[in-house]
Amino acid sequence: MSHSHPAGLLATYNSLTDKHLAGYFNNTRIRRHLLRSGLITRSGRILSEKEYKVNNMKQDHQKYIRECLARAIFHKVLDMERYHQLEIKRKLDTLARKERIQRLKGEHTRRFIEDNMPVLTPHPPAGPKTNRGHSVLAEEGRSSPLTLTAPRPYTAPGNMQPPVRLQPLLSSRQTRNGSKITSGSKPKGSLLESEALFPLGGKKAMMKFRNYMDHSQKEDLYQLPHINSYHTPVPPTPQPQAGKNFRDKRLESWRRKRLRPITAPNGLEPLFAKDPGRIYKTAPHSNAVITMVYFGKNVHLSYDDIDFRDEIKIYQQHCGGENLCVYKGKLLEKDTFQFISKRHHGFPFSLTFFLNGIQVNRISSCCEFKHRRSTRLGGKRGYFGFVCVEKASPCYRCIIAMGLDRKPSSTKPKKEKITEKKEEPPNKSQGKLRKDRMNAPSKRNEMERKESCVSAAFSAEEIKLGVKEVRTAIEEMEWKGKSGRDVWEEDQDNAVKYDYEEDFEVDDEKQDEKVDEDEDQADDQMSGGSKTPTESEKDNRNPEKKIETSSEKAHDSENEDTGCSDSEEDDRQDVKTMSSISSRSHPYSSESEDDSTEVGGEADSVSEEGSSRSSSSQDLRENDDPGKPHFPIEKYLETEIEEQEITEGHNGPWLTELSGMHVTEGKPTMGIQALSESEHKEPRRVASSEVRAKSQLQKEAGLPGVEEEVGQITGGAQEPGHCCSNTAPGLSPTDDGVTPMRKPEVNLGRGTEERAAISANEQPEQDAQEMHTLKEEAMKKDESSQPEDTDAHAGVREESGMQKDGTCHPQDAGIDVELRERVDMQEDGTCHPQGADMDVGLKERVGVQEDGTHYPQDADMDVGLRERVGMQEDGTHHSQDADMDVELKERVGMQEDGTCHPQDANMDVELKERVGMQEDGTCHPQDADMDVELEERTGMQEDGTHHPQGADVDLGLRERAGMQEDGTCYPQNANMDVGLREKAGISEVLLGERSPTGVLLASAEQSTEKGECYLNIASEAEAGTEGSSRHGEEQLIPTGKVAAEGSVFLSVEQARDRQKDEDLDRQALLQTQMEKERAVSEAGQELKAEFTDSGGLNSETLEEAAVLKEVGTSEVKEAEREVGSPKTDGDQGEEEALTELEVVGPVEDTGPERKAGSEETVLGGERAATERKDFLEEAPISASTGEVQASPREVFRGNHELCKEDTAREGVIADTESTAEQDLRAVFPGELAAAGGIEKVERLTPPLRETGSEREEETGPEVLKTEDLLGEQKVKGEEEGTAKEVGSEEEDRASRPEMEAHAKDVEPTGATELGEATKLLEDPPKERAITLSEATPQFGKSPKESEATATEHKGGEELPGQESKALWPQGRGLSHDGEGLLGAPGPEADKAQGPEGFFTARCEEWAAKELDSSAGSERLEEDQPLQAQREDIQRMTQGNLSGERLTRAVVVCGEAKAENPQGEGSEDKECPPGTVTGSLTGQNWNMGGNIVEAEEDPHGGGIEEPTAEQKEEESAESKSADGIPEASSAANAQKETWDGAGEALGEAAAEERTGTEDMAPRTEKVAVVEEVTSAGAMVETEQEQAPEAQDREGGETKASRHTGTAGEDTGSTGKDEEHQSGAAEEFRESVSQRETA
């Protein structure tokens, strides 16, 4: 086929005509394909394009036509079907209408007849005539049966009609029409009843009823119905008919199941039960009685149903087509039910099971006989199972499978012999019985060898069925009053006549030959054995049959002598049956090894007799006639019974008495005495002496065979005249008058008698031991019990000793052997039932009470609980103690009254550990139910209750709050972190009051009442400080929400008072620290710079929080300023510090670690570490204990040197910790940086600034700002010159004095702290606070949120320290709050420049972890572009921070990315998230002015530094914010701050590359980055370290400038703050632009 191509040869090319492809297309397969495709014809001609298209069109048309035809046919069929349905409906309507008409006509005619026939037909008057001329009674009598609605005869019991005037009518008509009454109405009524039970239904049933009523009316016209309203009419028995008679007998046959063997054919009745004059035919149905069990459902869904029974229906397909319901009923689980199978012969046995109308199982098998074994249908989860199948005959398939069709020739002689033996006269049988018993031991020895083979022949199922048959036969023998012989002979005759008489003897018959061979070998081995196996079998069988014959007479004589009633006889036989079952439960215990083969001597015969006892059941089984195949044990049982009776008859009344006593569990000693009195013969005496000697020796030796030999010797000594049966051994008196009794069975009573007989003088203990030994030996030897001892189960009798009085208590007999061993019997010799039922292990652990009874509660108590919980003095356990959780009990002491309050028990363990119990020993439910996080954030009120809003306080807040003076632990104090508690001890000085949790909460509460959200933030700061583990949780919390949650409403005046009191102490501390700081001013300043860089994270976060606060709550800030102005600087410093700490919350969780040395970590380099140590000495004074505690986490931010320095700090902090926790916060450079950020936040919240605590915090944040400004100015200095930096420093100095003045206005303490902070940070706290306030309004962040942010920043510093512990490799770049997410200083990590480089690498790793990506650390690497890192930071920020912060973080990252590639290089790449974050963090503290300066144009290559004018504006704005927050200036400052943050990113990267020496510049940049990041995440705060590396690179000139005079720093700070406000605005604008982009 040609294909269209552009032009040339390709346009006309046809592959089919290409000669080069001729060979290809000549391929048969290809040609077939082309032919199918229609490209060539059958002849091979290639079709043209036109022909091909025509052919395709034709094919498509044909396909379309076919589809149309199919559619038409389909619709036609639908129309036809619809029409057909309409026709059917119309016909049905017609039929129904006709039927309705006919019914109406019939009813009309019948009414007419009923009304007129009585009038037309003459009959005696039945009563007063009505106007219509018929009897009222007659009308009433016939009205009910003629109604169509009652398909029951009018004689039914429901028709209660009073006999009105019946006597005269009945008297006259009974004589004349009595026969009609009997044959007419009653039979038909009964017929109707039987038919109504299974109505055919519908029209046919109604017509049948109608016809019947018509006929009955005609026949009963001349008589009234025979009505008796008080009796149910019973129709007379119909005339016997052949069919009916057979049916009745067949139905009764299964009820007489005990009279017939199980394998009897179902269709045939025993001959004696049938009438020989009639010919019977086999029933078509199997009529097998099937017993099943309903196991129940696995899942029960309907619990509201009162009736828990399930409806069961079983249908049987009895003849191949029709289903018949053979069972229907409601059953509970484990219920058994019976039904009769109606399977027709030749059809399979098929059942369908329905459970509540749902088919659940089906079975189909050849016949019922196949299911004779107990099986569960459907596996483990089946609903039904077979219990037994009776009257089931095997089908041909089963007969062939079981081999029943092959009958050995030996079976018939056996049957004949059995019948002959039974027919022998009793005298001969008795004579032979004696001889056979003498020879029985040798024969039984032979049979013992055969038992193994014979036992295999009998399956467990056959044994069970055999036991059933035995029981049935014995019961029938008693019930029918027939002799055992007659019953057995009838059974034998029936068995001979049945074709499947050997259902259970198949294996036995197959092994007959093997048994004969074994017998021959046994005879050869026996010394005295000369008989052939057949003779021995005959000998064994003859005595058995004779025993049966004589047993009948003996049985009668026994009844006469003992006067036993039939009921007693039944009881005995039942007991014997049980004993036989028990003996069969231990089939064929081999004892031939213990038996001797000698037969000559009497003593030897006795030993053989012992073995014969054990093998009696075996012999009987082996010798069971094939005629009774399914009675393997029945003969044995019967033989035992007969032998017992014969023995009793020959021995006289004494033997009968003995056996009766044993059967009834009488005293065995009485029987022994009777025997000893009745028998006094020489041989027995000799035997008794021998027995006694041997038994004495064996007893002394402790041999188990004592009992056996005793029995053997006794048997040998007995005279032949003494009838010794195989199972009932004779008894001979010994010389001392004691009759040693042989233990023929595993009978405890017999064993006891033997022991008593052997040694009457021995102690009961020895007897008991010997008895136990004899019991074990008897169990091994003989599992069958003697007839007279059959009442006691063999095992039970052995294990339960008889009492001194010779009686065995039933409860003792039922006691488990192991239990008996462990549980001693009481003194009275009886075992208490409760002791018997008690678990052995429990009894071992739980002592029996003095009264010998166990308390149920002790028995039920868990052992472990008993061990842990001591019993009360009264010896009883309290249920509540027993139920108490062990772990809870360990932690919760019991009350004085010894009881545990439920509410205490239910209290969470962790909560109980943190929250002390009230003085009354009870825990308030609200405390127990309070969310852990809620409790951590909210301190308890003075009344000891929690305010819901305070319940959300972070757990970390609870950890840092100390106990109150009253000794009770407020939940927030109780939850104080252990490390914090250790580092910040509870001091009597105002530590608890001034603690962030205590005083700051109070001040926060007060300010919150007045609308000061910053106090709320302070609460959060506490929460954050204590619960820094909740990463960024507070950051994520909306400002308003945080304020609401963290705020504790207190009046401003109260907060003021508290803070003033605390500020006094803090002022003293601050003064002391300031002096220390002066000593190490420059070193401290450098350390401050570095520490500020480390703390710059916090400052950034704080500034970021401040920005957010200002944006969210500009108005609130004004109110807070107003409210906060009254507060002392120290108070607000505390509160703001707390606020910062709270905002830094997670960071301050590291606070304790900072105290330990986290501040050292803040310092980037060794030099920084050293300086920072000095600074730490100063810092602890200004910083609050909480800050100090928070500082330990900062320690980990930096390198190990920082940690060391932190250790030094810890020493200093320890000193200052008790006095001023918040002061320490303000003092620490890192914390001061954080505090600076916080103060910026506080600027956002003017009240904080106004208060003394605000001054402190402002001092810290402003110091950070100063450092940031210095850093930025240093950056400018690098770019523009150091002169500009000097100017900025001067501005910082100027601003710092202003702040100091403001602090002094607020409170002298605040001024002192400001002075210290100014020295440390060289940044006026006032201006810094203004910067914070300005930055905050821009972001619209509520004061609380801003404080939370500031706290987060602070935490950024501190937390990095904390995290640096856990995440030391990650560095401080990441905080628990998620600040570290954005801040993972990559460049420093890659550079590994000093401690800061190392710290930066750690921060990068932490950032990677925070980002949950393996690339996190790589982002921190130099290779990764800043953009990727920025994206990571964004993700981290988004995960942990609010939208504003995320946005800022993104912007910062973006700017950092832009800046880093331009100005920084690979280090900038490293900087991305971590460095940028770090720089942002460090610079955020200084964002007010330094950010603007450090901020690079995101799009520009160089770092944009805010002009001096901008700085001145920023300073002015900060000052104005310090006095009155200006939203515009704050916005501008924030924008500038953001711009500065972007620049700071670039600068931070550049500086980090340049070196890590300049900690201040790095801190500044970090502050810028932090503030930007703080908007994004406080995680960036931790990455301050990366910026620190940049700051170091930026030059130590910045650090030197930063560490310059305080005046220069202050002046630079003022400028920086001005620039920061402008830069914040610019930065925010750039952020907004980027967001819009």
Swiss-Prot record:
<feature type="compositionally biased region" description="Acidic residues">
    <location>
        <begin position="558"/>
        <end position="572"/>
    </location>
</feature>
<feature type="compositionally biased region" description="Basic and acidic residues">
    <location>
        <begin position="1614"/>
        <end position="1637"/>
    </location>
</feature>
<keyword id="KW-0966">Cell projection</keyword>
<feature type="compositionally biased region" description="Basic and acidic residues">
    <location>
        <begin position="1115"/>
        <end position="1130"/>
    </location>
</feature>
<feature type="region of interest" description="Disordered">
    <location>
        <begin position="1238"/>
        <end position="1445"/>
    </location>
</feature>
<feature type="compositionally biased region" description="Basic and acidic residues">
    <location>
        <begin position="1319"/>
        <end position="1329"/>
    </location>
</feature>
<comment type="function">
    <text>Component of the primary cilium that controls cilium formation and length. May function within retrograde intraflagellar transport (IFT)-associated pathways to remove signaling proteins from primary cilia. Also involved in neuronal vesicle biogenesis and neurotransmitter vesicular function.</text>
</comment>
<feature type="compositionally biased region" description="Basic and acidic residues">
    <location>
        <begin position="478"/>
        <end position="487"/>
    </location>
</feature>
<feature type="compositionally biased region" description="Low complexity">
    <location>
        <begin position="608"/>
        <end position="617"/>
    </location>
</feature>
<feature type="compositionally biased region" description="Polar residues">
    <location>
        <begin position="1476"/>
        <end position="1487"/>
    </location>
</feature>
<feature type="region of interest" description="Disordered">
    <location>
        <begin position="145"/>
        <end position="192"/>
    </location>
</feature>
<feature type="compositionally biased region" description="Basic and acidic residues">
    <location>
        <begin position="619"/>
        <end position="638"/>
    </location>
</feature>
<feature type="compositionally biased region" description="Basic and acidic residues">
    <location>
        <begin position="534"/>
        <end position="557"/>
    </location>
</feature>
<feature type="compositionally biased region" description="Basic and acidic residues">
    <location>
        <begin position="1589"/>
        <end position="1599"/>
    </location>
</feature>
<feature type="compositionally biased region" description="Acidic residues">
    <location>
        <begin position="500"/>
        <end position="523"/>
    </location>
</feature>
<dbReference type="InterPro" id="IPR048257">
    <property type="entry name" value="DUF4590"/>
</dbReference>
<keyword id="KW-0963">Cytoplasm</keyword>
<feature type="compositionally biased region" description="Low complexity">
    <location>
        <begin position="579"/>
        <end position="590"/>
    </location>
</feature>
<feature type="region of interest" description="Disordered">
    <location>
        <begin position="1457"/>
        <end position="1637"/>
    </location>
</feature>
<dbReference type="Pfam" id="PF15257">
    <property type="entry name" value="DUF4590"/>
</dbReference>
<feature type="compositionally biased region" description="Polar residues">
    <location>
        <begin position="169"/>
        <end position="185"/>
    </location>
</feature>
<dbReference type="InterPro" id="IPR027962">
    <property type="entry name" value="ERICH3"/>
</dbReference>
<feature type="compositionally biased region" description="Basic and acidic residues">
    <location>
        <begin position="769"/>
        <end position="802"/>
    </location>
</feature>
<feature type="region of interest" description="Disordered">
    <location>
        <begin position="478"/>
        <end position="814"/>
    </location>
</feature>
<dbReference type="GO" id="GO:0005737">
    <property type="term" value="C:cytoplasm"/>
</dbReference>
<feature type="compositionally biased region" description="Basic and acidic residues">
    <location>
        <begin position="443"/>
        <end position="452"/>
    </location>
</feature>
<feature type="compositionally biased region" description="Basic and acidic residues">
    <location>
        <begin position="1550"/>
        <end position="1568"/>
    </location>
</feature>
<feature type="compositionally biased region" description="Basic and acidic residues">
    <location>
        <begin position="677"/>
        <end position="693"/>
    </location>
</feature>
<feature type="region of interest" description="Disordered">
    <location>
        <begin position="408"/>
        <end position="453"/>
    </location>
</feature>
<feature type="compositionally biased region" description="Basic and acidic residues">
    <location>
        <begin position="1264"/>
        <end position="1307"/>
    </location>
</feature>
<feature type="region of interest" description="Disordered">
    <location>
        <begin position="1111"/>
        <end position="1194"/>
    </location>
</feature>
<feature type="compositionally biased region" description="Basic and acidic residues">
    <location>
        <begin position="416"/>
        <end position="426"/>
    </location>
</feature>
<feature type="compositionally biased region" description="Basic and acidic residues">
    <location>
        <begin position="1402"/>
        <end position="1412"/>
    </location>
</feature>
<dbReference type="GO" id="GO:0005929">
    <property type="term" value="C:cilium"/>
</dbReference>
<protein>
    <recommendedName>
        <fullName>Glutamate rich 3</fullName>
    </recommendedName>
</protein>
<feature type="compositionally biased region" description="Basic and acidic residues">
    <location>
        <begin position="1342"/>
        <end position="1357"/>
    </location>
</feature>
